[in-house]
């Protein structure tokens, strides 16, 4: 195991429209002692790369102490997965960096402030997140932006990459919207925001070109490889490559087993030369769009 991600708790200062955490789960949380135990366990298994996530990890009063402890016991890379809102306070950002945070992974949910705030259901969140990203960059830390791909953002992925590259971001990933965890009625209401993979591909290509032109790294793990043209496969990777264990209160599982990353394979997948590097079709996606667009690559 090279990588561990610890979901510290599920409290958050956004109310994202696509995030459905059951009430009984929302109140679960690791204590500081629990977190240290899991950090120790991760190191005993050989992990040197750490993701700290949630929920929103920066809301925890012990977050700086947790980062410091992780560094002390030998984690070489500590990635804080945050919505970036509290990073708008430079003193807080610098405390995280001084404690040992080396990377900040920040999501962008819209192609403009209005779309981002609409998705977050947190007025002003884009503005504060943008300031937070700049503060993280000013601290000398790496910033990776996870771009949420929806029917709203799909056609402007390259614009998002160009803008954030202009302020210094050099790492991106494209995340296709997931409906996992939604009730049936909620999924029906929100399904119009989930684009078809085949519609995303050419817009993703433009984003890849924009990143290349900026000298930035970019990848996606959410577009099945049978849909990706051969010349775009260099931008594809699966979460399996991270050798990742995800740890949450009451749960522990491999990254490739996450319903956000894949799902059942089709009978025809057995004859696909890319099947070895594919995690299957997400069940929420198949319910909305079916599986007709997936053809085995010979």
Locations of the language-model features?
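Canonical Radical SAM [4Fe-4S] cluster-binding loop centered on the CxxxCxxC motif
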Residues: 1-33
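Cysteine-centered iron-sulfur cluster-binding motifs in ferredoxin-type domains/subunits
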Residues: 8-15, 56, 264-269, 275
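Short acidic/His/Gly/Ser-rich catalytic and metal-binding motifs that mark active-site loops
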Residues: 14-18, 115, 180-186
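Flexible mid-to-C-terminal extensions adjoining Fe-S/redox cofactors in radical SAM and related proteins
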Residues: 231-298
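Radical SAM/AdoMet-radical enzyme domain recognition
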Residues: 32-52, 60-176
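A short, flexible beta-alpha/helix-coil linker loop
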Residues: 23-26, 111-114, 179-180
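Radical SAM enzyme [4Fe-4S]-AdoMet core and its adjacent flexible, acidic
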Residues: 122-130, 134, 138-257, 261
